[in-house]
Design a protein with these regions (language model features):
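Amide-forming acyltransferase catalytic core, primarily the GNAT-like/NAT-type
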Residues: 96, 119-197
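Short coil/turn motifs at secondary-structure junctions
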Residues: 59-61, 77, 110-112
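Conserved GNAT acetyl-CoA-binding A-motif
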Residues: 95-108, 202-206
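A conserved beta-strand-loop-helix scaffold within acyl/acetyltransferase catalytic domains
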Residues: 4, 10-73, 159-199
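C-terminal functional modules
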Residues: 207-239
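Conserved acetyl-CoA-binding loop-helix of GNAT-fold acetyltransferases
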Residues: 74, 80-93
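Extended terminal accessory/targeting regions
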Residues: 192, 200-213
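Conserved active-site alpha-helix within GNAT-family acetyltransferase domains
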Residues: 101-102, 108-127, 212-220
């Protein structure tokens, strides 16, 4: 039976998260202390213990409201029993009941695309982008043809914290670099870590044209066909 996690489920959820994703304990602790209050956490319990769970993060795509599936996880001993599909169906129906338009996720690995398709999701291409200054005309033009997938501030702060834990840097502009996904500019205007593909275009980058784009195949479940046609990006706009 599906229920919503309670405060006393924190330790069990934390252990399942670490076991499933080998996540740093600092990241998990930050999430539970600063983000959990803003998310919905459906769980399936078997014999009083959590067998499967996921987090639902509120988000928006333009005027459309929805939820993002995060940390979908099932104990090894309970995999293959259909629990995650039950949770995903429950989550989608929950979205509809609350008046939301979609349920969104980014599969952790390529092998999961077929699985999520069977659960009613469609592939939904997005790009990861960092816009250094949205007030500059060229950047505004770049933003006009795409919809930003936006999250609550507590969730954004959590992802910033993740980058710090895994070796990124926070600047006064508020965003970080992690691996080659993003680039940042510090408070003095100096660039920190420019991806190889963009090094030849440093003059363009210094002109504040948006950059740091990377196509990410995501998936979305929705009754709204217009959403399937949107060109979207996920990232932070530094204004």
């Amino acid at each position: 039976m599906i229920e919503f996690a309670k405060t006393n489920d924190k330790n069990e959820l934390s252990s399942l998260w670490q076991m499933t994703f080998l996540e740093d304990s600092k990241v998990i602790e930050y999430f539970f202390n600063n983000v959990l209050k803003d998310v919905v956490t459906p769980v399936i319990k078997i014999d009083g213990e959590i067998a499967s769970s996921l987090f639902l993060l509120p988000c928006k795509i333009g005027e459309y409201k929805g939820m993002c599936v995060y940390c979908a996880m099932t104990k090894y001993s309970h995999r293959g029993k259909g629990y995650m599909k039950e949770l995903l169906d429950f989550s989608y129906n929950y979205c509809l009941e609350k008046g939301f338009d979609f349920l969104f996720l980014v599969p952790a690995e390529e092998s999961l695309f077929d699985y999520y398709e069977k659960c009613g999701f469609n592939e939904f291409g997005i790009s990861r982008r960092i816009i250094l200054d949205a007030t500059i005309p060229e950047n505004k033009e770049r933003l006009n043809y795409q919809y930003k997938i936006d999250f609550d501030s507590s969730i954004i702060d959590y992802w910033k914290n993740c980058c710090v834990v895994y070796g990124g840097e926070i600047t006064d502009f508020g965003l970080v670099s992690r691996d080659d996904e993003t680039v940042i500019r510090n408070a003095k205007g100096d660039f920190i870590e420019i991806p190889q593909d963009y090094k030849k275009e440093k003059t363009i980058i210094q002109g504040d044209i948006s950059f740091g784009e990377e196509y990410t195949p995501a998936m979305i479940r929705t009754e709204n066909k217009e959403l399937l046609e949107l060109d979207c990006y996920i990232g932070i706009t530094l204004e």
